């Protein structure tokens, strides 16, 4: 493993990943891979998650293609050095910030969206000029295999490497020194990744999870609310990091919510949900049994049917859920939706704030002041008002968690920034040494006073131009008054 990481590092040190033209070529090659081998990619995703190819395309491939196009369109601007404002002491110098690649990046993917969750950060790492080692999740083995097969056929084989394996291989990888580690997964493993990274002082981006709350105000259209929640909760069989984990609402709304979700489930998946091509399965037997254990002692108002042989769990709703029970102590990551009754928005806000910061917050209400109040009074990785999950689709947003739901962010420009070092550069002249005497010993109060004058006043090009014009105006006025014109 050490030899492989060193091989990738030597490829990075060769400098060929840095030129803009090379980065654009690699991104175009990646897009070509997705387009030309679409059927193979979709088949692998479908095999891992019992997902229809239409769902695999809409949930993963579209996002990847959109991200590549966004990078190709904007990358020439992002890589350009940006001038900064200057003070009087540096007004004659060149001062700018130059984005610089970090080096060798490790991307550790997750199994629930096994393609997009490794390729989307890879896009950002390539755009920033890095070399990358990719470790797909071993639980989504078909996608891991197809990625390992296809990437070397389209991308630089020395700079972008896929390493497959399980816990042992990941543990060995984490012993190596990287310049950034990007991990998507659960909080427990996130802590292990961060601990390993700390030994090398390696910065990390941790895309974790948590229990994303969904508050439903009594002032809303429950038909629309329940359609949107049903879509977001049961998509991918509930195995989505930003799926609504539980509902907070007044007790009087519970029966209406259950009924409307029931009707929507029938509309989305038909009378026989098990036969629907749009309803996936739990990834493996261990997660299947874990989710079943969360149902023990609960009041099942909808669903609850299971089939261990196919790892099927029906869309399920629990009512009158006690916050102290097991289902409210861990991220569900499955098609089980608890409803916790609260008296009002104040109690809902307190409930959220008493727990770990979630990856997402969802609030439904016709009252936008109430939505913005909950935004102001809570903390979460992201927020969508009157819908779920949709903030993920906007690549001008940073996507990431806060607190135990993660650290750092990516998507669009935020991916480029995550994998770049913003390097400040000041270019001075070896002339005008007289002005530098102010900073040389011996010191004096006069030098300190002049230093304050020079350092505490900042200049940009516009202000410098105005200063020059003002100075020329004063000179012209003096000359006129002196009778030269």
Swiss-Prot record:
Transmembrane feature ranges: 464-484
Coiled-coil residues: none
Matching InterPro entries: Ald_DH/histidinol_DH (IPR016161), Ald_DH_C (IPR016163), Ald_DH_CS_CYS (IPR016160), Ald_DH_CS_GLU (IPR029510), Ald_DH_N (IPR016162), Aldehyde_DH_dom (IPR015590), Aldehyde_DH_NAD(P) (IPR012394)
Key word Zinc present: no
Location of this chain's protein in the cell: Microsome membrane; Endoplasmic reticulum membrane
Active site annotation, chain numbering: 207, 241
GO cellular component: endoplasmic reticulum membrane
Membrane association type: Single-pass membrane protein
Catalytic activity reported: an aldehyde + NAD(+) + H2O = a carboxylate + NADH + 2 H(+); a fatty aldehyde + NAD(+) + H2O = a fatty acid + NADH + 2 H(+); (2E)-hexadecenal + NAD(+) + H2O = (E)-hexadec-2-enoate + NADH + 2 H(+); hexadecanoate + NADH + 2 H(+) = hexadecanal + NAD(+) + H2O
UniProt-listed PROSITE patterns: ALDEHYDE_DEHYDR_CYS, ALDEHYDE_DEHYDR_GLU
Residue positions of motif Prevents secretion from ER: 481-484
Predominant place of localization: membrane
Function: Catalyzes the oxidation of medium and long-chain aliphatic aldehydes to fatty acids. Active on a variety of saturated and unsaturated aliphatic aldehydes between 6 and 24 carbons in length. Responsible for conversion of the sphingosine 1-phosphate (S1P) degradation product hexadecenal to hexadecenoic acid.
Subunit structure: Homodimer.
Family as reported in the entry's similarity comment: Belongs to the aldehyde dehydrogenase family.
Protein name according to UniProt: Aldehyde dehydrogenase family 3 member A2
């Amino acid at each position: 493993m050490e030899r492989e990481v060193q091989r990738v590092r030597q490829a990075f040190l060769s400098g060929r990943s840095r030129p803009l033209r090379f980065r654009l070529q690699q991104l175009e090659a990646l897009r070509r891979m997705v387009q030309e081998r679409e059927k193979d990619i979709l088949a692998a995703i479908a095999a891992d998650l019992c997902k229809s190819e239409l769902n695999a395309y809409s949930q993963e491939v579209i996002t990847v293609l959109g991200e590549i196009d966004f990078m190709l369109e904007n990358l020439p601007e992002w890589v350009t050095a940006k001038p900064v404002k200057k003070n009087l002491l540096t007004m004659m110098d060149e001062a700018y910030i130059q984005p610089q690649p970090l080096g060798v990046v490790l991307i550790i993917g997750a199994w629930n969206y096994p393609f997009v969750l490794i390729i989307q950060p890879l896009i950002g790492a390539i755009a920033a000029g890095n070399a990358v080692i990719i470790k797909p999740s071993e639980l989504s083995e078909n996608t891991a295999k197809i990625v390992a097969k296809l990437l070397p056929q389209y991308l630089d084989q020395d700079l972008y490497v896929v390493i497959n394996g399980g816990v042992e291989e990941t543990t060995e990888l984490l012993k190596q020194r990287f310049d950034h580690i990007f991990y998507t997964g659960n909080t427990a493993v996130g802590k292990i990744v961060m601990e390993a990274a700390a030994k090398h002082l390696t910065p990390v981006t941790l895309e974790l999870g948590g229990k994303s709350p969904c508050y439903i105000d009594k002032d809303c259209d429950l038909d629309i609310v329940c359609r949107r929640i049903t879509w977001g909760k049961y998509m991918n069989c509930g195995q989505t990091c930003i799926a609504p984990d539980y509902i907070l609402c007044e007790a009087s709304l519970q029966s209406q919510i259950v009924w409307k979700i029931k009707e929507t489930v029938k509309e989305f998946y038909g009378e026989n949900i098990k036969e629907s091509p749009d309803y996936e399965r739990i990834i493996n037997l261990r997660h299947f049994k874990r989710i079943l254990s969360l149902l023990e002692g609960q009041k099942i108002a909808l669903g609850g049917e299971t089939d261990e042989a196919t790892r099927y769990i029906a869309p399920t709703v629990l009512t009158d859920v006690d916050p102290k029970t097991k289902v409210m102590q861990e991220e569900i990551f499955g098609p089980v939706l608890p409803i916790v009754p609260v008296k009002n928005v104040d109690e809902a806000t307190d409930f959220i704030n008493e727990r770990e910061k979630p990856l997402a917050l969802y609030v439904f209400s016709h009252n936008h002041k109430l939505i913005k109040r909950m935004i102001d009074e809570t903390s979460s990785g992201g927020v969508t008002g009157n819908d779920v999950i949709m903030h993920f689709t906007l690549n001008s947003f940073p996507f990431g968690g806060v607190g135990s739901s993660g650290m750092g962010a990516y998507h669009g420009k935020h991916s480029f920034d995550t994998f770049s070092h913003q390097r400040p550069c000041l270019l001075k002249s070896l002339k005008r040494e007289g002005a530098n005497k102010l900073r040389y010993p011996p010191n004096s109060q006069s030098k300190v006073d002049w230093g304050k004058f020079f350092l505490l006043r900042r200049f940009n090009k516009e202000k410098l131009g105005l200063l020059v014009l003002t100075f020329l105006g004063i000179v012209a006025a003096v000359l006129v008054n002196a009778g030269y014109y």
